[in-house]
Amino acid sequence: GSSLNASGVAGGSGGGAAIYSSTGGTGNSGGYSPVEGYAGGDGTSGGGGGGGASEVGANSPVHSGGDGGDGVANSITGASVTYAGGGGGGGRTDGGKGGTAGAGGSGGGGAGTNDNSAPVAGTDGLGGGGGASGYYSGSSNGADGGSGVVIISYISTTAKAVGGTITSYTDGGDTYQVHTFTSSAAPHTITANGDVANTRAQQKV
């Protein structure tokens, strides 16, 4: 999100705008196809919701924060998990305005806040956006976004490489090995064991 009277910032998914009719940031800043993220919502007398990986953030209702856009589901780990939801916009309740904070989008988006309560951070490992602060929060800072994740899978009954946290699952008669990296502090390295004949990566996110 953005400070008072400021437009949202562009990114993979756009940031929601601050209050007073400012404009949400554009998404998909890398120009990718398919689209990697959507725009943030516009602000009125509340903040717009942050864009998610599958939809735009909601524009602000009167005095309330817009909801964050939903993320996108992916089954690379063998179970459907939704990633990269947008953070909720901030609302305001001063002077009896009765606004509400925006909800975070599915996929780890954090909720916004009203006034003096703290916004909710995005969920680590899902890459969700952080919620925005309220109008009289005492701070213009929103919550942090959640850390992302790198996942690689390939068909094999045994792991053919080392690196990350290794899990496996079976689907349709095929067994998949899954390498998951959640740390942002270390390089993400996958090293083949040497027995990689006829093995190819099936998916990566």
Named regions from a protein language model:
Residues G1-V205:
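Low-complexity, glycine/proline-biased repetitive segments and flexible coils/loops
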